[in-house]
Design a protein with these regions (language model features):
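Glycine-rich phosphate-binding loop plus the immediately following alpha-helix
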Residues: 124, 147-191, 215-225
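Conserved phosphate-binding catalytic cores of ATP/NTP-utilizing and phosphoryl-transfer enzymes
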Residues: 1, 109-131, 310
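N-terminal beta-alpha supersecondary unit
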Residues: 2-72, 78-82, 111, 115
Length: 338
């Protein structure tokens, strides 16, 4: 069996072909960073137009590298959401057309579930139960995984996601886009204790996240210290802000560990490429005597290999895909907390 996965939830146009043995025959990702850089963030209309321009090439190149034809595919998979609705519809419409023409199943995939599945691409035997921290530009969520394909939402962001907070501070300082990698590079030689940021935490015992207060505190520091690209303590400021974001992420994860008693921890999503976060995450896992799993950087950011992999797992376990033309995209988070 071979499955073609398509991912267009935000600003990467991606396609991948996986076998039922989870061997990646090809994976192509076309970034739009240069398109959105002048605006300091993703412009939804430009993103969807760029997907329209690129998707035919990306899928064709993916099939060429995999040395497979449409007739050689057994199923298709596509991200349904959450994400930018215009971008999602480009990928979904393209996948529907292929699946309907070839009379093959089309598996609809949730973007956050696909990010969790990315950990299994290289670590197929992760012990359960597990707690997964999904951190990306648009989402920050905690999940409890009782087993494969069985996840429960523990907490999510109430406002800005971690990646959004990093991007917005970078944009305010004129550091470039995408902001997260720029901040990481400039913060590498800084003192993370130079500027004090309070740990944001929701009321009661909630495991939800909120980064708007942290962002506001950073903007206040920028105003009070006249922080700029040329400020002598810019590296210290960025290191302190990055450290505060990481502490906030792992504080909730640590409380989830105490409450739900997992045997494994998973870190995934685009922000999981951050070296400081990866280091602190592994330190937490070691101190808690838990196994830790993080995808390789290439599988942290949006890609179609994780989409195809989740489809393979669903088909392997007997999950029946819906009717091709009935599938629809959804921009908002809809995973149940039950």
């Amino acid at each position: 069996m071979a499955v073609l996965g398509i991912e267009t939830s935000c600003d990467e146009t991606a396609a991948a072909v996986l076998t039922v043995e989870r061997k990646i025959l090809s994976s192509v990702v076309l970034s739009q960073d240069e398109v959105h850089a002048p605006y300091g963030g993703v412009v939804p209309e430009l993103a969807s137009r760029q997907h329209l321009h690129s998707i035919g090439y990306v899928v064709g190149e993916c099939l060429r590298r995999a040395a497979i034809s449409l007739d050689g595919l057994d199923a298709y998979a596509v991200t349904l959401g959450p994400g930018l609705i215009g971008s999602l519809l480009v990928g979904l419409s393209f996948a529907k057309g292929l699946a309907y023409y070839c009379q093959k199943p089309l598996v609809g995939i949730d973007h956050l579930e696909a990010h969790m599945e990315s950990a299994f691409l290289e670590h197929p035997d992760i012990p359960f139960p597990a707690v997964a921290l999904v951190v990306s530009g648009g989402h920050t969520s905690l999940f409890f995984l009782k087993k494969r394909l069985d996840s429960k939402l523990l907490g999510r962001t109430r406002d800005d996601a971690a990646g959004e907070a990093l991007d917005k501070i970078a944009k305010f300082l004129g550091l470039g886009y995408p902001g997260g990698p720029v901040i990481e590079k400039m913060a590498s030689a800084g003192d993370p204790e130079k500027f004090a940021f309070s740990l944001p935490r929701m009321k009661n015992s909630s495991l939800d996240y909120s980064f708007s207060g942290l962002k506001t505190a950073a903007l206040k520091w920028i105003d009070e210290t006249k922080m700029s690209k040329n400020h002598p303590h810019l590296g210290d400021f960025l290191a302190s802000f990055e450290e505060a974001v990481v502490r906030a992420l792992l504080d909730n994860l640590s409380r989830a560990v105490q409450e739900f008693k997992p045997v494994s921890l998973i870190l995934c999503g685009g922000v999981a490429r951050n070296k400081r976060l990866r280091l602190r995450f592994e330190e937490l896992a070691r101190s808690s005597r838990l196994s830790s799993f993080i995808p390789s950087p290439q599988f942290c950011t949006d890609n179609a290999a994780m989409v195809a992999a989740l489809a393979v797992e669903k088909l392997r376990t007997g999950k029946k895909p819906g009717r091709v033309l009935d599938l629809d995209a959804y921009p908002r988070f809809i995973i149940s907390t039950e």
